[in-house]
């Protein structure tokens, strides 16, 4: 049966000239036949959702340890929220929604158990062997560590999806070849030897909307979780003019609203205003740049999808509030110290005795290795753990496991 692509409900004429074209991608590292019913970016998104790494996000920390309660966000719920915002932005700007969604869904694959605390601890123990970077780890997962296909390791994503993943925070190199944020992690350089991701250019606009969607979701939902936990109060939110304005708006319309509904009304307005701000900035910058292709977006001298100066200042104020009231809260700091101890202890135990990893694959690959490659394998194993698995593994090996409640 022949499929008429022109009659399918995607990839139509509404896509902007500067959008990524799902039918003429820059390919995959391992060539594959195309699908008659799905674009390459749809296939990327579907492959991402079916990975083990995606399922593990369910039990990885966003801010609060995954065992704290059913209503707090995990990496998985955060990822889904980012994907929803990215897709909305992509539709508004006439981009390829599947590419934007796929980049959003894969962006946190490399995160360790216990959030940034786990990443910092793993980076510390891996410093003698090159350190740890969650973006580079995400790339390793989708190009090497996921083992699902007969003909290759990884999930063989398109160049555009990998570019969006690697350039989540913008170009990694200056035009002169210097690192924009320090040395480029070696796994990224190694992959670029095989499939050059052009680290000195900006990513597609689809990848840019996925990145700014991450910021929008972080700020909004960390406030929501902070209020739920009691670490934040409405009075604290009043310190930020933008949030104070939203609260006044909600109170004026709903003067007797219960706290949970009041919170939701603030959050939905915050997301809406931030999304509209990004769309407005992108439209303005596109009107100046007048790009005629996705290549013109990459060659631009600045990011297109971003906050206005006023919203960027609000973003800084919100991050400062979250850092002060939540991330540096004494209770959270105690939990973070315990989480770091778990990661450090497990790394030392597995380096000393790889059989304690209780995985034939990892043990077989480590046998006889020198310390540097052994440490990288142990790091991969630890980074893939969920919060709950790391805690149970520590309890099996040690007499005392820190209380993370």
Curated annotation (Swiss-Prot):
The keyword Acetylation does not apply. The keyword Ribosomal protein does not apply. It comes from the Bacteria. InterPro entries: dGTPase, dGTPase-like, dNTPase_2, HD/PDEase_dom, HD_domain, PHydrolase_assoc_dom. SMART domains: HDc (SM00471). Residues 75-219 form the HD domain. Disulfide bonds: none annotated. It holds the Pfam family HD_assoc. One of its GO terms (molecular function) is dGTPase activity. Keywords: Hydrolase. CDD domains: HDc. GO terms for biological process: dGTP catabolic process. PROSITE patterns: HD. Belongs to the dGTPase family. Type 2 subfamily. HAMAP family: dGTPase_type2. NCBIfam families: dGTP_triPase (TIGR01353), PRK01286.1-1 (NF002326), PRK01286.1-3 (NF002328). This is Deoxyguanosinetriphosphate triphosphohydrolase-like protein. It comes from Rhizobium etli (strain ATCC 51251 / DSM 11541 / JCM 21823 / NBRC 15573 / CFN 42). The lineage of its organism: Bacteria, Pseudomonadati, Pseudomonadota, Alphaproteobacteria, Hyphomicrobiales.
């Amino acid at each position: 049966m022949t499929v008429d692509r022109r009659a399918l409900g995607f990839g139509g004429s509404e896509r902007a000239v500067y959008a990524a074209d799902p039918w003429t991608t820059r390919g995959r590292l391992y060539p594959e036949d195309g699908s008659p019913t799905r674009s390459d970016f749809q296939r990327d998104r579907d492959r991402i959702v079916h990975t083990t790494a995606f399922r593990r996000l369910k039990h990885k920390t966003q801010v609060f340890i995954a065992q704290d309660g059913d209503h707090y966000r995990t990496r998985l719920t955060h990822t889904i929220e980012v994907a929803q915002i990215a897709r909305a932005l992509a539709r508004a700007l006439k981009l390829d929604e599947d590419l934007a969604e796929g980049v959003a869904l894969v962006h946190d694959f490399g995160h360790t158990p216990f959030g940034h605390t786990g990443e910092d601890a793993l980076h510390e123990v891996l410093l003698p062997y090159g350190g740890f970077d969650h973006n580079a780890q995400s790339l390793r997962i989708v190009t090497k560590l996921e083992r699902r296909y007969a003909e290759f390791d990884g999930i063989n994503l398109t160049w555009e999806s990998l570019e969006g993943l690697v350039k989540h925070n913008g170009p990694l190199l200056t035009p002169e070849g210097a690192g924009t944020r320090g040395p480029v992690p070696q796994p990224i350089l190694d992959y670029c030897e095989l499939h050059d991701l052009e680290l000195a250019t900006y990513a597609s606009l689809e990848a840019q909307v996925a990145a700014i969607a991450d910021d929008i979701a972080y700020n909004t939902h960390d406030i929501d979780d902070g209020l739920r936990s009691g670490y934040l109060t409405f009075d604290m939110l009043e310190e930020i003019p933008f949030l104070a304005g939203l609260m006044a708006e909600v109170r004026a319309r709903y003067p007797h609203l219960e706290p949970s509904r009041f919170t939701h009304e603030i959050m939905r307005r915050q997301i809406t205003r931030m999304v509209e701000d990004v769309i407005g900035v992108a439209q303005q910058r596109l009107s100046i740049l007048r790009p005629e292709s996705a290549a013109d977006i990459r060659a631009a001298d600045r990011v297109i999808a971003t906050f206005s100066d006023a919203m960027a200042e609000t973003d800084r104020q919100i991050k400062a509030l979250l850092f002060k009231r939540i991330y540096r809260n004494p209770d959270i700091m105690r939990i973070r110290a315990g989480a770091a101890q778990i990661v450090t202890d497990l790394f030392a135990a597995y380096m000393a005795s790889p059989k304690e990893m209780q995985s034939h694959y990892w043990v077989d690959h480590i046998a006889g290795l020198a310390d540097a490659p052994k440490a990288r394998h142990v790091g991969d194993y630890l980074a893939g753990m969920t919060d709950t698995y790391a805690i149970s593994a520590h309890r099996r090996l040690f007499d005392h496991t820190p209380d993370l409640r």
